[in-house]
Design a protein with these regions (language model features):
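Extracellular/lumenal glycan-associated surfaces
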Residues: 10-16, 59-70
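Amphipathic alpha-helical binding modules
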Residues: 65-99
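Short terminal alpha-helical segments
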Residues: 1-33, 85, 89-94
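Amphipathic alpha-helical interaction modules
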Residues: 17-62
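Context-gated lysine
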Residues: 11, 39-45, 68, 94-96
Length: 99
């Protein structure tokens, strides 16, 4: 079943809320997840009828790659918070792939 852009939006929002609330999250991860949100806002703005354009999706995926790497490297991050970042990354990858 294909991933809808709405699901990507929700997964990124959940990950951002959890990272912001996790006192163990590194400042680097917090900054990277904020950039992920910024790229999401740009993608939403450039979309047509709720469908993001391809270039924006690629940019968003790159931000997701950075967020995933930062979450994996953050040893003090709560496991459920790490999982939410990984879920956001996976959602954007699936959207890009059309899966």
């Amino acid at each position: 079943m294909p991933v809808a852009f709405d699901e990507v939006i929700e997964k990124i929002a959940v990950a951002a809320r959890q990272v912001e609330a996790d006192g163990g999250a590194s400042p680097i991860l917090v900054a990277i997840v904020r950039e992920f949100q910024t790229k999401l806002a740009k993608t939403e703005k450039l979309g047509t009828d709720g469908v993001p354009d391809r270039d924006s999706v690629i940019e968003l995926e790159q931000a997701g790659d950075s967020a995933k790497a930062a979450a994996d490297a953050d040893t003090r991050l709560a496991p459920e918070v790490r999982e939410s970042v990984l879920a956001a990354h996976l959602a954007i990858c699936k959207l890009k792939a059309g899966a």
